[in-house]
Regions:
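Structured, active/binding-site neighborhoods that engage oxygen-rich ligands
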Residues: 1-268
Length: 268
């Protein structure tokens, strides 16, 4: 099964290495958490919003508040995004000018749902600007949604790379090994979106892509979510069934219901 599950698995596997970082490509890929990752919850909130509302900005705020407060747990409570934690906990409704990589991660379902590049960009902006109204926060979300849309619609890696370089001004010519040597933990769109793309661009399979993203030693869960989403959008790449089963076995029924419904409606 491909689709947003590629992002959920990537984030879940990367979660163990968000704090305890690794540069080892052959890291342990087993997922042993009893709950979905914080990134996965935000992704599900977006999918729920796209399927079950009129897709207004206020309804998206409500969906994020609902899902993120429902799964408010432990040290992985929305990573290092302190402002977002407060925004969720206090049920705030105003943006705070962030350009953190959360906007680029939670937008992933938009890339599957959108019927055109323009629609992907339009709705990516809506999902970003409720919190991440900084230009780089919006651009990161649009870059990810439009990349997923383009991959799904058969554009080649080189075509997508050229588009991102032209429209988003990202430097995507950095060799993967050079990126890995210098990559640091920095939870911003300008840092994470190009890095995630470079991992996918240089990958040969879904697992290879996620391993490359996690072993950058950066914001492992979010970068693996984005890179995994790119890989899963490619019809020539299969998300391994054993990874899907391993990651989702403990997830709640309501979480899985949204995941399955979105797959049936938009990912086939």
């Amino acid at each position: 099964m491909n689709g947003i599950i590629g992002a959920v698995i990537g984030s879940s596997i990367g979660l163990s290495y968000e704090i305890k970082k690794t540069k080892d490509y052959n890291f342990n890929m087993i997922y042993d958490k009893a709950n979905p990752s914080d990134d996965s919850v935000a992704i599900i909130a977006t999918a729920d919003w796209l399927m079950n509302t009129n897709r207004t900005k206020d309804e998206y705020i409500d969906k994020l508040h609902y899902w993120c407060n429902k799964f408010n747990y432990g040290m992985y409570n929305y990573g290092n995004a302190t402002k977002f934690k407060e925004w969720v906990a206090n049920k705030e409704r105003e943006p705070y000018n962030s350009y953190g990589n959360g906007s680029a991660m939670r937008v992933i379902p938009v890339g599957w749902w959108a019927c055109s590049l323009e629609q992907a960009a339009k709705f990516a902006k809506i999902t970003a600007e409720i919190t991440h109204n900084h230009p780089d926060g919006i651009l990161g979300a649009q870059a990810v949604a439009c990349t997923i849309w383009a991959i799904r619609n058969g554009y080649s890696k080189d075509d997508v790379k050229e588009w991102l370089e032209h429209e988003c001004k990202y430097d995507l010519d950095i060799p993967y090994d050079t990126l890995k040597k210098h990559h640091k933990f920095e939870c911003t769109c300008p840092n994470s979106v190009p890095a995630s793309f470079i991992c996918w661009y240089n990958s040969t399979s879904y697992e290879d892509c996620v391993r490359k993203a996690v072993s950058l030693g950066g914001d492992a869960d979010t970068e693996a979510a984005i890179a995994g989403a790119f890989a899963a959008a490619d019809e020539q790449t299969e998300v391994p069934e054993e990874l899907t089963s391993d990651v989702t076995r403990f997830f709640s029924m309501d979480f899985m219901d949204v995941l399955k419904k979105f797959h049936n409606e938009y990912e086939k």
